[in-house]
Amino acid sequence: MNFFLAIILTIVYCAIIKFVPVQFIFSTVGVVILAIIFDAIIVNIGLGVFNLIPLPPLDGSKVILPVLPYKAKYWLQNNEQIFYTIFLVLWVTGLAGKFISPIISWLASQILSLGGFIFGL
């Protein structure tokens, strides 16, 4: 859902750039509106990437658990609290961002490029 919302917001963002008069885009209100939409795009991509991390207790683990062998599934479920602690430490220290940020940046550039392509920007 987050990726879908990011794509919809990208279409809105590019449509504003394409069809709204330049005077409005460069006005204070226009800049603020575009900044809010752009930030919403990045936040939704970030949430989408975060949701796909395949470690318990995150949502991505629910995607991979059905396809894992029984022993791996059992091990992941029994060690969920350890993964939670590890992930919390990585997040608090900022190390998680070092892995996630490049993915978010790449996806954002791809989605924005798609929007630019659609609107001929």
Language-model features and meaning:
Residues M1-L121:
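Hydrophobic transmembrane alpha-helices and their immediate loop junctions
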